[in-house]
């Protein structure tokens, strides 16, 4: 994944991306490790603050609950004592039972990876897309259900209202084969606008 090549291509194909880059500056290439822990962490982080997610994750690590075998042998009460809700305890067990071949995933198409991951209870399309983008470094994936991306696109493209998931997915086709970098740029632009002008 070459950020410089991608941003040059996007700027040449869409002048508004060039304008956004002038505001955001160069985009960092932030990749995270792939594997079981990354997906488990994504489940833990769903619908709670970063601080709360970090606190729960640290308790889980201390208890050994980042290992699928230990999670499977633990009672729901033990998992809940580490801070997981009843629902997330079930999701953690479902992910542990899924026995995903994480090395094998790397060889699949992005579409097939997303299909594989979303078969697991607790992993939706957004979580799978973020995993493919940030843990596997795929260049042509776009999380069109992400509210920040939708709002950033509304502001950057001067749209009358925030585009819905399907509308943004259609828009993003024009940014292929660098849709993941377009997403990174839109997130950076969202943060820029939010910090300077206020964003609803």
Question: Each predicted region: which residue ranges?
Answer:
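C-terminal accessory module of base-excision DNA glycosylases/AP lyases that mediates lesion recognition
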Residues: 1-27, 106-111, 125-200
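A positional/architectural concept
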Residues: 9-42, 47-62
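Non-catalytic interaction surface on structured domains
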Residues: 10-12, 23, 31, 35, ...
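Alpha-helical ds-nucleic-acid-binding substructure associated with the helix-hairpin-helix region
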Residues: 16, 48-49, 53-121, 174
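Structural motif
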Residues: 29-38, 83-86, 172-180
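A general alpha-helix detector
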Residues: 38-43, 74-78, 112-116, 148-152, ...
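Short alpha-helical scaffolding segments that buttress acidic/His motifs in well-ordered protein cores
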Residues: 39-44, 92-96, 131, 182-186
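Short amphipathic alpha-helical interaction patches enriched in hydrophobic/aromatic residues
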Residues: 43, 75, 79, 99-100, ...
């Amino acid at each position: 994944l070459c950020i410089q090549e991608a941003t040059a291509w996007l700027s040449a194909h869409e002048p508004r991306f060039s304008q956004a880059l002038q505001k955001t500056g160069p985009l960092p290439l932030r990749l995270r490790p792939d594997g079981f822990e990354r997906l488990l962490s994504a489940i833990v982080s769903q619908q709670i603050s970063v601080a709360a997610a970090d606190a729960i994750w640290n308790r889980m690590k201390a208890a050994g609950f980042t290992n699928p075998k230990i999670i499977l042998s633990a009672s729901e009460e033990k998992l809940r004592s580490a801070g997981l809700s009843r629902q997330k305890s079930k999701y953690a067990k479902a992910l542990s039972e899924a026995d995903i071949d994480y090395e094998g995933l790397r060889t699949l198409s992005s579409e097939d990876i997303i299909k594989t991951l979303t078969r697991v209870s607790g992993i939706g399309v957004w979580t799978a897309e973020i995993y493919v983008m940030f843990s596997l470094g795929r260049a042509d994936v776009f999380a069109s259900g992400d509210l920040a991306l939708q709002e950033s696109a509304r502001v950057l493209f001067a749209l009358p209202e925030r585009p819905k998931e399907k509308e943004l997915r259609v828009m993003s086709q024009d940014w292929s084969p660098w849709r993941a970098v377009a997403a990174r740029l839109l997130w950076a632009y969202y943060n820029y606008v939010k910090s300077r002008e206020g964003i609803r």
